From Swiss-Prot:
Source lineage: Bacteria, Pseudomonadati, Pseudomonadota, Gammaproteobacteria, Vibrionales
Pfam families: Ribosomal_L18p
Signal sequence, renumbered to the chain: none
Subunit and interaction comment: Part of the 50S ribosomal subunit; part of the 5S rRNA/L5/L18/L25 subcomplex. Contacts the 5S and 23S rRNAs.
Similarity-based family: Belongs to the universal ribosomal protein uL18 family.
Gene expressing this chain: rplR
Name of the protein described by the UniProt record: Large ribosomal subunit protein uL18
């Protein structure tokens, strides 16, 4: 099994467990160049809030879009947008990525901005 297939297997398993809880989830995806985050409703069919380093507002705040500082900016933005929509508690879905580096930075930044998970 290659690296991507292993990550997808881990992500599927985690999503199944989150679906059993019926919780709103904060989904993180990372590429070498960008970081993306979405808050998805418990039914799985509605995106409540989204933020990424592709957005002009976030891109202007950071020098490089693929590093820890960019992930912190995305974490803060997603937390603010989720709180505006009335979502305070989420389940963190790391999409099979290791809780380290950019993924951890995004999570810590979202927690500091007021999101609970």
């Amino acid at each position: 099994m290659d690296k991507k297939a292993s990550r997808i297997r881990r992500a599927t398993r985690a999503r199944r467990k989150i679906a059993e809880l019926g919780a709103t989830r904060l989904v993180v995806h990372r590429t070498p160049r960008h970081v993306y985050a979405q808050v998805i409703a418990s039914n799985g069919s509605e995106v409540i809030a989204a933020a990424s380093t592709v957005e002009k507002a976030i891109r202007e705040q950071v020098k490089n879009t693929g590093n820890v500082d960019a992930a912190k900016a995305v974490g803060k933005a997603i937390a603010e947008r989720a709180l505006e929509k009335g979502v305070e508690t989420v389940a963190f879905d790391r999409s099979g990525f290791q809780y380290h580096g950019r993924v951890a930075a995004l999570a810590e930044s979202a927690r500091e901005a007021g999101l609970k998970f």
